[in-house]
């Protein structure tokens, strides 16, 4: 038995879990928020105990130091050497990283080389990697790429209809994201349905503040809604999703926005927040919709309609669908969103049992339907830990 830590470093946050492997038991989990501010928040829960502290945490390096100190202070671990591996979620691996890998100096350079493809995500991921390598030098560090699962997407599905040399010389193409989540829920669905993953055609809907749809055939990603960046595809909490590209120069040339202002608008002021004018949180939107707010209702119709467009396209491309999956914060917790999606898909043989849906059952389609509709809670941290364990075993025997 050994202890594996899964890390998800954001620009001002650090999410963590420690698993005992191979039993996959969660030993501790937590979140450090508002890093860089004097009132940063440290959250940690283990056994029946929860800790929440507000304190100054200047940077990610200090956050990691405090985390390791707290783990020892509360006897979650007695010595840092007990942590045999650390897995890091990395948003973008470009075309070079097609699978998880042990972190070396060369790997760090490779991740840094594609930072321009994920400027909001990769820099924080790199800070997390460097800090843990410094403070836990004997632990195996593994990078787990959100883009890796989508490297099986065929060229006709990942290329943009731009001059081909832009792909050859500059690697401009669809990469896709949420790969770790889509991979996990597909495998879990196969277990739930008691069918071989290799025999299933699955459409996975990862619906949270970020959202994407993925077509999975025989356990491999064959298409996904996100693209060159995580801003493409569905409208999201604050992201516009895919729009007509010529809107951007129109905003700049005709309406006087700077390019930076447009990009900030598309990433931080659009999507659910932009359309509703209320919030980026679907819980707030659903409350407003029930109260009759027309823009909240419009937001729900737009979001679910876009999801259905992708589902229909992917079911057609795969010549069928055996399972439709809902996962992540909205997908797992919003009966209304699931209902609005499924009621538009009757032509595919999709059904939604009202009682099962409202109860959050794992299978919410009517009995004996060909297309199984499932709620599968995602567990990206466990997927990261599993990847780390493979490499840790090779190192520690």
From Swiss-Prot:
Note describing how the cofactor binds: Mg(2+). Can also accept Mn(2+).
Subcellular location: Cytoplasm
Residues flagged as site, Transition state stabilizer: 178, 239
Chain residues that bind substrate: 89
Pfam families on file: Acetate_kinase
NCBIfam families: ackA
Full protein name: Acetate kinase 2
């Amino acid at each position: 038995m050994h202890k594996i830590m899964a890390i998800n470093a954001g620009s001002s946050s650090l999410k963590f879990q420690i698993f005992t492997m191979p039993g996959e038991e969660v030993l501790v989990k937590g979140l450090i928020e508002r890093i860089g501010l004097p009132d940063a928040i440290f959250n940690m829960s283990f056994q029946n105990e929860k800790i929440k502290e507000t304190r100054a945490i200047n940077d990610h390096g200090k956050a990691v130091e405090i985390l390791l100190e707290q783990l020892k202070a509360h006897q979650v671990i007695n010595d840092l050497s007990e942590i045999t591996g650390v897995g890091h979620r990395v948003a973008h691996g470009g075309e070079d990283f097609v699978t998880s890998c042990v972190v070396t100096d060369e790997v760090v350079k490779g991740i840094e080389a594609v930072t321009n493809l994920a400027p909001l995500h990769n820099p924080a991921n790199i800070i997390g990697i460097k800090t843990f390598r410094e403070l836990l030098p004997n632990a195996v560090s593994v990078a787990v790429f959100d883009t890796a699962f989508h490297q099986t997407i065929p060229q006709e599905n990942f290329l943009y209809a731009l001059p081909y040399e832009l792909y050859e010389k500059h690697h401009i193409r669809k990469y896709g994201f949420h790969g770790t989540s889509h991979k996990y829920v597909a495998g879990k669905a196969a277990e739930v349905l008691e069918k071989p993953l290799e025999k299933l055609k699955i459409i996975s809907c990862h619906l949270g503040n970020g959202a994407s749809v993925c077509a999975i055939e025989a356990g491999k990603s064959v298409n996904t809604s996100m693209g060159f960046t995580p801003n493409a595809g569905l409208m999201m909490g604050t992201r516009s999703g895919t729009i007509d590209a010529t809107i951007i120069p129109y905003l700049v040339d005709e309406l006087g926005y700077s390019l930076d202002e447009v990009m900030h608008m598309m990433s931080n002021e659009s999507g659910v927040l932009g359309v509703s004018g209320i919030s980026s949180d679907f819980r707030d939107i659903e409350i407003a919709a029930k109260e009759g707010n027309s823009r909240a209702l419009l937001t729900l119709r737009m979001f679910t309609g876009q999801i259905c467009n992708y589902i229909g396209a992917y079911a057609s491309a795969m010549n069928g669908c055996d399972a439709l999956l809902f996962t992540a914060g909205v997908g797992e917790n919003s009966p209304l969103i699931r209902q609005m999606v499924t009621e538009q898909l009757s032509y595919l043989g999709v059904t939604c049992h009202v009682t099962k849906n409202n109860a959050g059952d794992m299978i919410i389609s009517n009995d004996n339907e060909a297309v199984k509709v499932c709620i599968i809670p995602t567990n990206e941290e466990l997927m990261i830990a599993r990847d780390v364990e493979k490499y840790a075993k090779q190192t520690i025997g």
